[in-house]
A protein has these predicted regions:
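Asp-based, Mg2+/Mn2+-dependent phosphohydrolase catalytic module
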Residues: 1-4, 92-95, 108-208
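N-terminal helical cap/lid subdomain that shapes the substrate entry/recognition surface
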Residues: 2-97, 110-113, 121
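Proline-centered loop/turn at the N-terminus of a beta-strand
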Residues: 100-102, 176
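A generic secondary-structure micro-motif detector
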Residues: 15, 37, 80, 102, ...
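Small/polar loops that bind or transfer phosphate-bearing groups
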Residues: 16-17, 43, 103-104, 161, ...
């Protein structure tokens, strides 16, 4: 069998959490006095990095306050969070065929656990979350760590991502990247090696 591993982003790739994410961030932004337009383009980037990007001039204690606030809001709001079509079937097939995979997410561990449970997505013990890396997406460390946890070089790992920051992270880590067109268009993910209209296309693209 072809030696390969799969590294899946979570939000927008395996689960649809769009409504919950938007509700949480709109609430936090209104409370913090952050213009909503300042948050544009940050999908897929860890909350802590996003908040530092949009309010860099505020005191550290206040930055930490809003990081905690939006994380708490996201953990509490799981309404409508569900698996992306084809996700459960794909992961079941990978398990049946003993093809290694894990999750590489910008969520904190607590948020990832909450969302995978809500979406009924299995969360492997070797998943990579934001609080396990020093620099999250768009930096390459999350996918490098994900490949290490699979015991594979990044050169034979496929990363499945829906956001530009995640694509950049995976490409810079040395992975082959499949951009799933759930939250962004093909034109918005120009650096992905492949594009997927549906997760059921992944194994064929990978030659499996």
């Amino acid at each position: 069998m072809k030696k390969i591993g799969f590294l899946f982003d979570l939000d927008g790739t395996l689960i649809d959490s769009t409504a919950a994410v938007m509700n949480s961030w709109i609430t936090m932004a209104n409370e913090a006095g952050i213009p909503l337009k300042a948050l544009a383009g940050h999908h897929g980037i860890p909350a802590a990095q996003t908040i530092r990007n949009v309010i860099p001039d505020r005191e550290e204690a206040e930055i930490q306050k809003w990081i905690r606030r939006v994380t708490d809001l996201e953990i509490a709001d799981l309404d409508g969070v569900h698996a992306v079509p084809g996700a459960l079937e794909l992961l079941a097939e990978l398990n049946d065929r003993e093809i290694p995979w894990t999750i590489v997410t910008s969520c904190t561990t607590d948020l990832a656990i909450a969302r995978t449970r809500a979406g009924k997505i299995p969360m492997p013990a070797n998943s990579v979350t934001f609080d396990q890396v020093t620099r999250g997406k768009p930096f390459p460390e999350p996918f490098i760590l994900g490949a290490e946890r699979l015991g594979l070089p990044t050169s034979i790992c496929w990363a499945i991502e829906d956001a530009p920051g995640g694509v950049t992270s995976a490409k810079d880590a040395g992975c082959t990247v499949a951009g799933v067109l759930t939250t962004h268009s093909r034109e918005e993910l120009p650096h992905a090696d492949h594009h997927l209209e549906h997760l059921n296309q992944l194994l064929g693209k990978a030659g499996l």
